[in-house]
Amino acid sequence: HFLRIGANAGDGKMACDGIREVKKNGMKCRYSMMKGYILSAKELAEEAAMLEECGLDEITIMDSAGTMMPHQVSEYISEMVKKVKIPVAFHGHNNLGLSVANALAAEEAGASVFDCGLMGMARSAGNCATELAAAVFKRLGKLEDVDLLKLLHFIDNRLAPAMAEYGYKNPVSPIDLVYGMAGCHSSFAKLFSDTAEKEKVDLYELIIKVSEIDKKAPSKELIEQIADGMK
């Protein structure tokens, strides 16, 4: 069990008593440095070190307005991982469309935890979409234990229809995510969907398998051959 405490960057001293109380009650304590960008990277890292001394178990830099650029994220994370021994996390918003790029920058700089939301659901422009982050990290050979296609089907079949009732639209649909992950041009969409329906195989898996062989101009024959082998 854990409890997360959050305060604006620079206000960490007022959280020390709360951190100690959480620890006293046998829980792990995580801390969110909201609006982390209002301090310099060095100042934020120094505050993180102070909070670690209070007994903190994990600390998160929050890009609360979605204003940070990848090079800034890299600088902030790099400074912090040099200052503390506890895990450093990153929480990005997508106001500039950089949430995934920022997550990549954070990971490369030493962050080990990332806040995400399915379909990017969160306040304002949303958080880094869980499925996008998973796809990108899998492209890099990470998150091998994550069943991405199962997650995408859950979004297609359950989550997206439920959220449509509230007017929420997924900024990047699962099928478009698969095209990007596989390197498949969407002009072949009908050929793939018709074959998957006819042969009763998983569309997303078919796109990925075919694209491993031909990303330029997959033929109907190749697509049908791969589909037949998937049965």
Short names for language-model regions:
Residues 1-231:
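Catalytic cores and adjacent flexible loops of soluble metabolic enzymes
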